[in-house]
Amino acid sequence: MAEKKKVAEEKRVARVTDIIAGSPKSFEDAVQVGFARASKTLRGITGMRVLEQRIAVENEKIIEYRVRMEVIFLVEN
């Protein structure tokens, strides 16, 4: 019986939301910027997945690296 209770306590529900972040430095920095910002408002982040990468160009120069990401976080009780 105690084992069934343990399994029930381990059940979790997660939510996924999309964000877009940018950086003038690199794609890696854009991911860090996105994670830092998401961490300010979302609790229980368990993972992120980069869905898309884009580069903004102006006057024949790269001005921003952009990433679209899924943020996975646990839903609180």
Give names to the regions the model predicted.
Residues 2-77:
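N-terminal, polar/charged subdomain of small-to-medium soluble alpha/beta proteins
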